[in-house]
From Swiss-Prot:
Name of the gene this protein is made from: gatB
GO function terms (MF aspect): asparaginyl-tRNA synthase (glutamine-hydrolyzing) activity; ATP binding; glutaminyl-tRNA synthase (glutamine-hydrolyzing) activity
Family from the record: Belongs to the GatB/GatE family. GatB subfamily.
Function: Allows the formation of correctly charged Asn-tRNA(Asn) or Gln-tRNA(Gln) through the transamidation of misacylated Asp-tRNA(Asn) or Glu-tRNA(Gln) in organisms which lack either or both of asparaginyl-tRNA or glutaminyl-tRNA synthetases. The reaction takes place in the presence of glutamine and ATP through an activated phospho-Asp-tRNA(Asn) or phospho-Glu-tRNA(Gln).
Keywords, comma-separated and alphabetical: ATP-binding, Ligase, Nucleotide-binding, Protein biosynthesis
Gene Ontology BP, a term: translation
EC number of the protein: 6.3.5.-
Domain of life of the source: Bacteria
Pfam families: GatB_N, GatB_Yqey
SUPFAM superfamilies: GatB/YqeY motif, Glutamine synthetase/guanido kinase
Enzyme category, top tier: ligase
Name of this protein: Aspartyl/glutamyl-tRNA(Asn/Gln) amidotransferase subunit B
Amino acid sequence: MAANTGIIKGNTHEWEMVVGLEVHAQVISNSKLFSGASTGFCSEPNTQVALFDVAMPGTLPVLNARCVEQAVRTSLALSCEVHKYSVFDRKNYFYPDLASGYQITQFYFPIATDGYITLDECCSKDVRISRIHLEQDAGKSMHVGDKTYLDFNRAGVALMEIVSAPDFRSPEEAAEYIKKLRIILRAIGTCDGDMENGSLRCDANVSVRKVGDSNLGARSEIKNLNSIKHLAQAIRHEACRQVEVLESGGVVSQSTMLFDVDTCTTRSMREKEDACDYRYFPDPDLLPLELTTAFIDNIRASLPELPSEKKRRYMQDIGLSRYDADILSSDKDVSAYFESVVAKHAPDLAVPWITGELFGALNKRGSSIADSPVSAGRLVELLDLVADGTISGKMAKQVFALMFETEKSASDIVREQGLCQITSEETLAPIVDRIISESPDEVAEYRQGKTKLLGYFVGKVMKETNGQANPGLVNTLIKRRLAED
């Protein structure tokens, strides 16, 4: 059986994947959705827990306005319709790390619906976002030997559940969607998008159908995928598994699956519940959430330039390639750094230094641009020295490496190392004359048409001057001298 992007070639038919994603994004907020407990990460277990978070009798939820603002901000950035009226419901189920026995969510009337994200890499399409709603996160169970320990630090942290329509037809489309969603959430400051630490988690609903069939097959839900790589692997394996079941005469059951990262396979966790199993009903302790037009408009006005808009501007106004525009618009810290540099220097000089030298050095160190020892202002200073001919491009790379290592300015390093470029014709002309007079055979060959020997003479001059001679001036002087009789 072969799988080619979203089409699986079985023994009897070609099958098409149909995938929808449910993303749980932790809201950036100082306190939880319904309590004043802190949301700080990496604290000691059970040190950030309010009485409400563990369902102590008599405690009541108090809605965090900041979390509502963040959900509206996200909804607007994803082109959703924000509803002025929404309701919090109780989703009833038992699990040890859910102390109340129910999760407060929004089932019947979510805060937003009908948005989209545009894919433009692996394909060109709009992926519909069916709904966005606010809900509580659960605590965390830790299994050690035959014991289970509960940490309620995460219990009650605000989540935005962002639910897509079943519009994906390949793992690659799903992966691109998560990348773009994460870039948007980071750009608007509503979620840090850190999948490794669980602040962005993804469930994938996967089914298959024969190519050309419009009916949807029974779906499996793969829970808690914590990397884009694992998401793509899980979707592909589960789709192929379902095809094998169907082609062998079996029936795909609606089930909840787990993805084993060691074997890259999915396995059944339990039969998937229907909505009726959760017995949703409006939470009697919370009034409906009613938003005003002014509240929504104020948040809309505060939205920053979105990454897709920034990418378009970089391509149309600055003239960047699609590739460079994509890299430089995908992170707000990178964008700010780039715009500071390009305000002083042309893009064709600034871009290679940022995407080449700077990114290369940061990757080796494992650092982000926010932690770069070479600030945008320091890089501008270095490029000033290149532009005015003080140092050559080759020298600049040496200076940059020292800047990155020592955090000194370019001017200080050039002065300390004696790296100023030699741009005086009076200084270079005698060196050129001597090298040419010492190379009669090479001069004769050059004058007979072997013009590639120009590089030989340039190299000799550069070696003589320890690489400090201005290459352009050296070329001019050598050509002029060799043209003489």
